[in-house]
Regions:
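Protein maturation boundaries and topogenic segments
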Residues: 1-90, 148-152
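Extended, hydrophilic extramembrane loops/domains of integral membrane proteins
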Residues: 119-152
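Short strand-connecting beta-turns/loops that link adjacent beta-strands
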Residues: 104, 117-118
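Short coil-to-beta transition motif at edge beta-strands of beta-rich domains
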Residues: 88-101
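A residue-level detector for short acidic-glycine micro-motifs
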Residues: 69, 114-116, 143
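Short beta-strand-centered aromatic/proline hotspots
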Residues: 95-96, 108-114
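Short coil-to-beta-strand transition motifs
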Residues: 101-110, 135-140
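Residue-level recognition of conserved beta-strand edge/terminus positions
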Residues: 84-85, 100, 144
Length: 152
């Protein structure tokens, strides 16, 4: 066992593979991971509700009032209006979606952080880990946020 360990650090080509693996592991442990973010454009407006309704009408979309939960800070502070369009097949990693969660009776706005065979895994921007119980499928998907209007 000790001879194999010594060979892993000294004998060519094993030492190269060992050092590459150690550097990769160190990189994963000590370099902060930044998730993919595809933020919608944020527009300041004197009357954000009217501006959002006008944009939604032009895009054939829908307007959602954003509540003050803090789960999507700093993108969404609360009090804004989000404009969504329905395009489930085109959803991409990092986009902000509106959906009906099975654990909550009101629509939720969170970011798509991963996809598996059960749908999109969602999480708020302030969450340390994904909220694995929240999955978005075509059945509970309400829209992709394309614009946010807030009071200036």
């Amino acid at each position: 066992m000790l001879a194999r360990l010594k060979a892993a650090f000294t004998a060519w080509p094993y030492c190269l593979a060992t050092y590459v693996a150690l550097i990769g592991a160190g990189w994963l442990l000590f370099v902060p991971f930044e998730p993919v973010r595809r933020d919608p454009t944020v527009y300041p407006a004197g009357n954000p509700q009217l501006a959002a309704e006008t944009a939604a009408k032009a895009l054939d979309g829908r307007v959602w009032a954003v509540s003050h939960t803090g789960s999507m800070k700093p993108l969404l502070q609360g009090g804004e209006y989000a404009v969504t369009v329905k395009e489930y097949p085109k959803v991409k990693l990092g986009q902000v979606l509106v959906y009906n969660a099975t654990y909550h009776n009101t629509p939720i706005i969170h970011r798509a952080v991963d996809k598996d065979r059960h749908g999109w895994l969602m999480a708020g921007d302030t969450a340390k880990q994904s909220e694995s119980w929240a999955r978005v499928t075509e059945q509970n998907y309400l829209g992709t946020v394309v614009a946010v209007y807030r009071k200036f």
